[in-house]
C-alpha cells in the first residue's frame, strides 16, 4: 500500500490520481471531507487525519511500504511561524517516527529550502546555499527544518529521498491557492509589479516526478522539480498571462522597497510577508532530476495556457 499525506491538496490530488491510473493501491490522508470523497471515487482508501494526530498517523501509515509526504502549510506572515513549524517541521518529524522504518519515504520539500538566488543569473541547484537572512522568511524556515529531519533520517539509514518543487501551477486548483495572482491580475487588482522572479512547474509534472523519484531517486539526495523554461520575472509572467487571456492590464514597475512599503498601506491582494518572498529571485535548474530520474517537464507555455483557461472557465 502507498500512503500519501496531504492527499486533498492541489498536488496531493494530482499524485493520487496518477497513482490510481497506474493501478496502485493508495491510502489517501487529508482533512477535507469533500475532497476525500472525490479520492474514494478514484479507488483510493480515504483517511481523515491531521498531521498533529500521532495515533491517527501511526494507524494510517501502518503497512505502507512507500510514503509520499506531500502535506504542508503555505503561509508567509510572522504570525504564521509557529503554525508553519508545527506542520512543516514537526509534522515531518512525527511521520518519520511513526511510519515503517523500512518504507521508502519521499519527502516533498521546496526550492524555498535552497534559495533564493542573488539575482536572475544565480540559478538554484540542489547544492545551492540559501542566504543568511532566509530565517526571516517563515515559510522557508519551516521547510528547511522539515527537510533537515528528512535528510537526518536518511543519514541514519532510512530510505528517504527529497523533492524540491518550484512554484507549482496548473489546471484544477479549485481553492485558488496557486492561481490567485492570475485572478487578481486579470481583475485589474494587481496594479504594480516589482523586480524578482519565480520558476514555474506544472502540477502534473511534479506528480510524475514524485513517482519517478520513488522509483529511481537516490536515498539521502535532493531533486529539484522545476520547469526547464519556467524561470520568469514577475513582469514577464503577467505579460504572458495577459496575452493568453486577451486581457493585458497596465502595471507600474516599482522598486522592491517601495513595493514592500505599499503592502503595509494596501495589504490586499499582496501581503507584506508574501512580498518579501516575491521580491527575491527563485530561478531554478532542474538538470539533475532530468538527468538522473528522467524528469521531463512540459513547456511552460502549455502549462500557462491550461492554467489561464482553467481560471477563466471557473470564473464564469
Region locations from a protein language model:
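Mid/C-terminal beta-alpha module of Rossmann-like enzyme folds, strongest
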Residues: 209-270, 302-316
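Conserved catalytic-site region of short-chain dehydrogenase/reductase
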Residues: 76, 111-121, 168-175
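N-terminal Rossmann NAD(P)H-binding glycine-rich loop of SDR-like oxidoreductase domains
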Residues: 2-24
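Conserved beta-loop-beta element that borders a ligand/cofactor-binding pocket
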Residues: 147-171
Amino acid at each position: 500500500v502507498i500512503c500519501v499525506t496531504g492527499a486533498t491538496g492541489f498536488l496531493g490530488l494530482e499524485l493520487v490520481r496518477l497513482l490510481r491510473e497506474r493501478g496502485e493501491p493508495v491510502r489517501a490522508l487529508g482533512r477535507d471531507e469533500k475532497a476525500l470523497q472525490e479520492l474514494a471515487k478514484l479507488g483510493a482508501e480515504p483517511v481523515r487525519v491531521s498531521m498533529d494526530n500521532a495515533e491517527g498517523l501511526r494507524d494510517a501509515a501502518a503497512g505502507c511500504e512507500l510514503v509520499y509526504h506531500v502535506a504542508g502549510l503555505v503561509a508567509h506572515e510572522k504570525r504564521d511561524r509557529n503554525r508553519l513549524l508545527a506542520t512543516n517541521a514537526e509534522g515531518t518529524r512525527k511521520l518519520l517516527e511513526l511510519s515503517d522504518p523500512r518504507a521508502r519515504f519521499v519527502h516533498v520539500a521546496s526550492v524555498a529550502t535552497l534559495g533564493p538566488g542573488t539575482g536572475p543569473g544565480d540559478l538554484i541547484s540542489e547544492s545551492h546555499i540559501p542566504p543568511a537572512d532566509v530565517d526571516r522568511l517563515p515559510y522557508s524556515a519551516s521547510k528547511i527544518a522539515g527537510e533537515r529531519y528528512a535528510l537526518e533520517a536518511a543519514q541514519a539509514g532510512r530510505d528517504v529521498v527529497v523533492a524540491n518543487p518550484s512554484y507549482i501551477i496548473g489546471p484544477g486548483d479549485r481553492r485558488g491557492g496557486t492561481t490567485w495572482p492570475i485572478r487578481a491580475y486579470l481583475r485589474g487588482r494587481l496594479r504594480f509589479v516589482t523586480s524578482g522572479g519565480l520558476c514555474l512547474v506544472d502540477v502534473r509534472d511534479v506528480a510524475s516526478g514524485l513517482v519517478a523519484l520513488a522509483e529511481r531517486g537516490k536515498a539521502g539526495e535532493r531533486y529539484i522539480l522545476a520547469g526547464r523554461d519556467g524561470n520568469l520575472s514577475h513582469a514577464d509572467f503577467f505579460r504572458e498571462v495577459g496575452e493568453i487571456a486577451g486581457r493585458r492590464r497596465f502595471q507600474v514597475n516599482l522598486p522592491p522597497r517601495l513595493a514592500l512599503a505599499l503592502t503595509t498601506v494596501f495589504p490586499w491582494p499582496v501581503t507584506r510577508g508574501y512580498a518579501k518572498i516575491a521580491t527575491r529571485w527563485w530561478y531554478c535548474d532542474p538538470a539533475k532530476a532530468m538527468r538522473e530520474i528522467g524528469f521531463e517537464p512540459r513547456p511552460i507555455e502549455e502549462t500557462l495556457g491550461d492554467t489561464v483557461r482553467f481560471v477563466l472557465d471557473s470564473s464564469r
